[in-house]
């Protein structure tokens, strides 16, 4: 500004020779005084405006020439023409001051408007450049973020590849596990077959033991019968002995009577004495026979005692074998249950791993698709950014070239203006010398001229003092959401909020994969003893019995007269060994009779063929599979019904019968009223053996829920949809068995 004021002071000493003011007489000076003043003021104003505009243009153009657009070329040409016209007008102002005052004013106004337009264009260019800078910064930030994202994507892809390799390794390991499990299952099947074979052998041994026990019981009954027969024979012998004693007494009486009549019966005395001797011999024989019978009785008692002891030993052995077999069966059942739980766990683990692998593959496919989409988008963005960067580089190169051209032209224009200013200073000095010779007389005031045009808006004044703080305005509308910033550090845990209101019940989800089975529960109490089994196969032939004691040999009697034929004598001593005789008859007949006895038919237990008996009921375990209604009709055709399980013992027996088989229908349903389970005859359920989490009435999103119950692999109850196909169990009352069959 100081330079501008100095230039104005220098301009005030202008000369006016070039503008048509010539020296003359004093009168002409007076006449032309007003015109000279007006022309001088006009020249000062024009020069000041020109210097100000040139200085402002130079300052603005030098400051903001980096962001000049293509439209500056046309404006520059017009400005060059206008500057040339201004120079020519300045050169011709001395001759054409009066004529072209209005034209200069109009040109100045147009020049001002052009300068304002140029300022606006420069402001727009600066705004565009600032926007372009912001866009460049944003593009650079986006490029950096894209680079970071690409690195993150590479890391995620590496992690995914590592996960895929680990999944493949785990799959290989699971394949090894599956092969090992298959081998284990084959080994288990072999063990099961061996256990079944050993179980069959044990059953055969038990049947043989039962047969031997039955034979021993029959032998004991026969021995008891023989003992009873011997006791009867002894009673008969005692009765005979008493009769003989009575006879002997009668004989004594007769002898007394005969002694009285000895004289008359002397002929008969010899006979009577012979008869007495014979009677004495018979009595001695009877005494000997009684002693032999007592020895035989002693032998029989010893044999019976030995048999009783052997029976007791056999019963103890039988009880021990039964206990051992029961313990073995319980151990086998526990092992079977453990094997079943292990197999179920393995199946559940395999299903869980398969489900997990499916989810992993789906997630990997989703990640792959998202990665491909993001990569394609990023490649498109990068191509667009590269194109925009190329365009920006070309624009910047063209702007720099235009800036260089404008600088060179400004330098030339400033040089021309400096030359013009030097010439004007010289003219001003000359005019000052000429003005010293002028005598200016003040003439009468002229008429008031017309109102001039409104001047241009002045520069803004200095900023005033800061005013008082105004009232707080209304909150403005929320601005657009900014870009998402980086994730900040994790803040401290907030206070626990109040308990929210209970939400509405959501829809029932899909049926999940079977959970892992729980630990094995404690063994239950031993059940009551079962009913007696069927008669087994006949056992082997028993050993021969003990040999009886040999009787005592009687003394030879005195030969008497030949009497009546007496009783058979006691067997004598064994004679010498003779030649071998023909083969004798076979051994004891009772075991043979037992061996040849036919096995009882299946109707002996009161159940038809292919039906099994338990307590007073008969059960049919189907081989075919039907839906619930068809199974119910099948049982009704057999004059029975689907099984009703009303006790723990019945449940355990049915569990043993269905071990290792598929699911079976039972006569339990809630089709009449949901969640109210009843047997088919309408009776409520007293005993329950539902699986954990059942019944769940799972509908799987189609049709009705699960309204029919059945047994699963572990013997527990589960609800099924009634249109599923399963095996079934029929139940009916056992028919009365005739006593003749028993």
Swiss-Prot record:
Region of interest called Disordered, as start-end residue ranges on this chain: 439-608
An individual GO BP term: phagocytosis, recognition
Principal subcellular localization: membrane
UniProt biased composition (Pro residues): 516-532, 571-585
Tissue distribution of the protein: Highly expressed in lung, spleen, small and large intestine, stomach and brain. Expressed in neonatal microglia.
Domain C-type lectin: from-to ranges: 614-731
Protein name: Collectin-12
Organism: Rattus norvegicus (Rat)
Gene assigned in the entry: Colec12
